Curated annotation (Swiss-Prot):
Binding-site residues, ATP: K201, H221, G237, L238, S239, G240, T241, G242, K243, T244, T245, E287, R323, T448
PANTHER family: PHOSPHOENOLPYRUVATE CARBOXYKINASE (ATP), PHOSPHOENOLPYRUVATE CARBOXYKINASE ATP
Reactions the enzyme catalyzes: oxaloacetate + ATP = phosphoenolpyruvate + ADP + CO2
InterPro entries: PEP_carboxykinase_ATP (IPR001272), PEP_carboxykinase_C (IPR013035), PEP_carboxykinase_N (IPR008210)
UniProt family annotation: Belongs to the phosphoenolpyruvate carboxykinase (ATP) family.
Binding site for Mn(2+): K201, H221, D258
One protein family per Pfam: PEPCK_ATP
Keyword tRNA-binding: no
Keywords tagged on the record: ATP-binding, Cytoplasm, Decarboxylase, Gluconeogenesis, Lyase, Manganese, Metal-binding, Nucleotide-binding
Biological role stated in the UniProt entry: Involved in the gluconeogenesis. Catalyzes the conversion of oxaloacetate (OAA) to phosphoenolpyruvate (PEP) through direct phosphoryl transfer between the nucleoside triphosphate and OAA.
Protein name: Phosphoenolpyruvate carboxykinase (ATP)
Enzyme Commission number(s): 4.1.1.49
Amino acid sequence: MVDNTQITKTISLEDYGIKNATVHYQLSPEELHNKTIKLGQGVESSSGALAVNTGEFTGRSPKDRFIVKDEVTKDKVWWGDINIPFDTKKFDSLYNKVAEYLGDKDVYARDAYACADEKYRLNIRVLNEYPWSNLFAFNMFLRPENQELDNFKEDWLVLNAPGFKANPEVDGTRQENFAILNFSKKIALIGGTGYTGEIKKGIFSALNFVLPVYENTLPMHCSANVGEDGDTAIFFGLSGTGKTTLSADPERKLIGDDEHGWTKENTIFNFEGGCYAKVINLSEENEPDIYKAIKPGAILENVALDANGDVDFEDVTITQNTRVSYPINHINNIQKPSTGENPKNIFFLTADAFGVLPPISKLTPGQAAYHFISGYTAKVAGTEAGVDEPVPSFSACFGAPFMPLHPTEYAEMLSKKMKAADVNVWLVNTGWTGGPYGVGSRMKLKYTREMISSALEGKLENVDYEKHNIFGLEMPKTCEGVPSEVLNPRNTWKDQNAYDLKAKELSNFFRKNFRKFEEYANEEIMNGAPVE
């Protein structure tokens, strides 16, 4: 709960090299909303939420994300296409340019923090060029009580200047936009892009280094909820697999929908204070929690509005990546504070468009590590190109773009924690059944919810299982509320020989993707691989 006492504190930005700026410190959501409209940077939708257009960039730009290579990072970061090194001197020069750019401007400053567990709290100061970016920071990070602001000292600084354009030839960037992490100076420097997700994912990436390296805590790209008995469930999954949908359960309290830590004390905590949900094709019937959260204080990004300010959630004219951010207290059924104990069940969600993987299966520790490192889902190709074949997509740890360390480091931490806590790990296919995309149909959400509920309630502990002939996964033969023929995907295909061929094809994709990890993976992990 944020108190409403008047904030009288003021701050100077001179120490950051930002001279003569007009500083707007810790403005309320209402003030930031009104300033955005007054500046012509957004409009109010019929629900009272602020609607903005983020400009040229409507999503993250992973090829323009850098980490400063220095004494802290050079031997720890897994350098490559995901973690691209940046020169220390170039960083200092670029930082000074951004600071100079923000001089004489209105700058919106916010003190906030990440990590709902006080032991792991990371204080953040966010400096924004635009008021709506600062409202995003209010929504997404945890909000300190006003009395905490008097002695607030940031651990990390986020400097965010969407209007600043880098000169790639001079500044060492790839193009005019950039998001750079400096672990020695503890700065996230973001410029040339108005996409607010860069702010959120900048701090997430920082925590994905800081927590495992210094705190023996596993950072996870997952959602989490907790039952009445205090049992925590964790849902890993890439975009579009159902993380947000499936963790919103009327019988369980939401801890968070995207970023969490699993501590050495075997507790779970949310990194964030808000949610950043996709709203493409959103309906009140399918996603009531998100739909109702779109109210004053929320920010809609890149959506289409009609003359009355009503949102057309099916309109993808600007982007398919339409979003809403809101503080977590816009949702009713939440855990306060956003922490949990004793993880009992972990779900790896995948939308398998090949129609091969079972709707639910139980994993051994080796299989769990293998599938965690693989991070598989499938993308359905765009119809404009006339391509109907699904495309496999692998993202290590279900969040490769945000993981500075080698994926096997996170996988080994997860394995140790799973064994110590005796956790059940389930692979859940929210994708296709009865054939691949174009032939089969999407798994019914009703069935997926039934299977997850059965797993959470322990109803799958005493049923018979059968082993998948290629992936070696243990598939329950029965599950309450789900037709038994659905549980073995091979039985849902008219042509079972075609199924076997498709399963081998998918198995080959898995094995090919995993080659780059083989030299780092132990025997137990390699035993979790599908057969050739």
